[in-house]
Each structure stands twice: as structure tokens, then as C-alpha cells.
Amino acid sequence: MLTVRAASRRADFCAGRGRIYGETQEARLVGNQRTHIMKILIACMPATGHLNPLLAITRILLAEGHEINFLTGSVFRARIESSGAKFVSLQGAADFDGRNILSVVPELKDIPPGLEWFRVAIERLFVDRIPAQHQSLLQAVQECQPDVIVGDDMFFGVLPMLLGLRSKRPPIVLCGTSFLHLAREDGAPNFLGLPPATTEEQRRQYADIAREYDEAVDQPSLLCLNKALNTLGVGPLSAPLFHSVVELADAYMQLSVPRFEFPRQIPPSVHFVGTPPIIPGQAPLPPWADELDGSRKVVLVTQGTVANHNFELLIAPTLTALANEPDVLVVATAGGRPVETIPCAVPSNARVASYLPFEWLLPRVDVLVTNGGYGSVNQAMSFGIPLVTAGMTEDKADVNLRVAWSGVGVNLATNQPTQEALRAAVRTVLDRPAYRMRASQMADEFARIDTRSEILSIINQVVVNQRVALWADTVTTSGPRRAIRQR
């Protein structure tokens, strides 16, 4: 039986705070508008953090009766086919297993975190894949004849299409599966976890840092990118890779809410659509499910599905740090890896599992301890869960910076926090109501967005816009000739 606290959390969920995909939807309706059935091609990087939100969007589209072809890595064939979409495999260098980027780009193992690591990751993981991604995309378009392409923001194989004639391609909608990759108002470069400048001195410091970042990362990777684009007959680009796709997409769906982004000028093509619904039934209930009855505070710790090769970074120290907290039940998920790989004894107040059903779990969680995966952070916020974050790799420094900046949690700003720091941070978030209050306000903002309707409306609108533009071009070019013939 649920306690008052747990029952309240469930009531919040039922009222729309937190999103879980429902099997019963109003078929083919967007607001009061009936949509046409479309052929939609999904294009996705073969990495779990990109795949999960695109699969959730796929299920929304399938429920509307749309025909979905899903282009991604062969390692995810079973997941795509089980969703009801038709699987289309990436080819050549584009078909890799992004669940372990160190196996994809082995040289990153020998490069310490820093600017050189970012440059190599951008060039080897993203730029080098563009020709094969683009060729795979062209083949899929030829075979599927889609009305629209929906891609994740790091499937850069769409760039040659975006740089070509719009009339020669389907409309392209991209999904922001990371923080919004636009230039910052204070001039700070992205990916370094720098807080918004509050003084002119900070702005001057950021200008110096930006020059160093531009010389070490942006310019070399842009040179590499433009060489690749030149071989495909397009380009060059003048803006950095991640920034360019935001500006070039016909529509860009940021999978979050405005409150979680720094204030800045945002193009009208960018739409905040909330977080995609959790797909239910991905894992069974654990045998200890009844223990999450609200009698103890539940702390969930996860390292996600990418940076989970070393559980000594976060999961093990969190389990040990909270072992003597009598009012806390710690739940750890291994992101699909065997629980035996967790390198510590499991304390009596902890429960572990390889996978857990998040649609059941999140309404019962009081604090999430995470390395800062964008999808996990946004899902937690949509349920009003405050956070403790510790991660500096990939995009995590900037994601976790936003956690602290928005007031929904504590950012430890390190890849390997100490047990003492973890315990203090968790107790701070549990014991100070301000964090839960800010997380609750964030959940309210998520609840105000009808994610399903927004996604359907945006995709439908870009298709309509494309048809109108093509019709207008036809009228403009053929109108006078028709008039002459009518004489």
C-alpha cells in the first residue's frame, strides 16, 4: 500500500507530471486538425541516448497510422522491429555500435579529457561517418520515398541535403537529444561546463577561452568537415558542426523545456516540445518492487547506457556512501550490464538491477544521482525529481551545469566524486525543500507542453510548408506560359 507521500507522487503523475506512452491515443488528430497519413523516415545515430527518444517519437507516429522506416545501426534491429517500424540498416562506416564509443574510436582511450579529446571525438565519431551516413540516407530516401525525414541532432549525414536545394529533398526535422547547441550570449564555448557570465570580467575570460577552443577544436574540426562535404559536392560551412544543424533544419524539436536553457536568441525554427514519453514494458518489475512503498526516501543512481563501462565512477561510491542512511533506500540500475559488474558489496539498504521499468520507478523516486545523460535528466525533471549530478565527458558538463543553474539539483562537476561529496550532496537535496520546489516547478513546465500534439503538429507543418513552397514555385515558373497558351 502506498503512503501519503508516494500516493501524492502518483497523483502528480496521473495529473500529467511525467510522461509515459499510452496505447490509447486520438488517432490521426492534432488538436482539431485531421492529419494525412505520411511516409516518415527516421534517421538516428546508433547510440542508445539518441535511439530512445527517437523510438518514443516513432511510437507516437505509428499510433497515428503513419508508415515509419527507421534508419540506424544493425545492432538495434530487434528494438526497431519490435516497435512496429520497418528497420533500415546504415551501411559501411556509419554502421557501428555507439553504446561504447571507446571501441568505435580507440584512440580516445589514450587522450586525457580536454580540448584534444573533443576534437578527436568530433572528427572520428561524427565527421568521418558523414559520407557513409549520407549514402545510407540517399538509398533509404530512394527506396522509401518519404514525405519527411526526422533525425536526431547528431545524425550529420543530413548535412549535404540541408545544404542542397530544398526542392530536391524531403523536409527535415531534427530532434535535440542534447542541450541546445547554439552560440551563447556571453560568448562562452559549449561543452566546457562554464556558467553564464555575470560580470564583464567573466565575459573577457570567456572570450579568451573561446579563442583557445576555436583554435584547438572548432577550426580543425570545421576544416575536416568541409573537406568531407566538398567530396559530396556541397559546402563549405562557416559555423561549427553542432551549431549548423540547428540553424539549417526546417524544424528543430528540442526535447526539453525553455526553463532548462540559458536565455539567448533562438531561431523561430526551434521548438521546445518537452520530453518524449517513456516506452513502457522495457523491463519487468523487480522482485523487491513492494519495498518502494514510500516508507523510505528512494535514491536512484544510474550511469546510463554509454558512460557505464566503469561503475567505480558513480554507482559503487553512491551505494557505499549511502549505506548507513537508515531513511534511504538506494536503487541502482546497471544500464543493461550484469549487476555482478558493480565493484562493491551491495549494502542492506540497496537494491540493484540490470534494467528497470522507469515508467513504474520514476514516480517513486525522491532523488536521481546520475552522470548527466540528457534524456535521463529531462525525464527526472518531468516527474519533479531533484538531482545530484557528476559527469564531465561528452555533453555532460553542460547538461549538469544546467541542473545547478536551474536550481533543480547539485552539480558535483567531476567524473569521479568522493563518497563524502556524494553523501553530502544527496542529503542536501533530500533535506532542503528548495530543490524539490524547483524540481516541482520544472515538472509543471513540462506538464504544460502537450508533447505528442507538438511533435505531430511540427512534423505535419513542415510537410505542408514544403508542399506550399513547391506549389508556389510551380505557379511562378509555369503561370505565364499557361497564360500564353490560353490565348
Task: Describe these PLM feature segments.
Residues F70-F118, Q202:
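Conserved nucleotide-sugar phosphate-binding/catalytic loop shared by glycosyltransferases and other
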Residues T58, A353-R402:
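A donor-sugar binding/catalytic signature common to diverse glycosyltransferases
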Residues S256-V367:
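Donor-nucleotide binding loops and adjacent catalytic segments primarily
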Residues I37-Q91:
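N-terminal subdomain of nucleotide-sugar transferases
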Residues Q419-R487:
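C-terminal amphipathic helix plus adjacent low-complexity
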Residues F126-Q205, R259-F260:
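Conserved nucleotide-sugar donor-interacting segment of glycosyltransferase catalytic cores
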Residues S103-P160, Q205-E247:
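Conserved nucleotide-sugar donor-binding subdomain of glycosyltransferases
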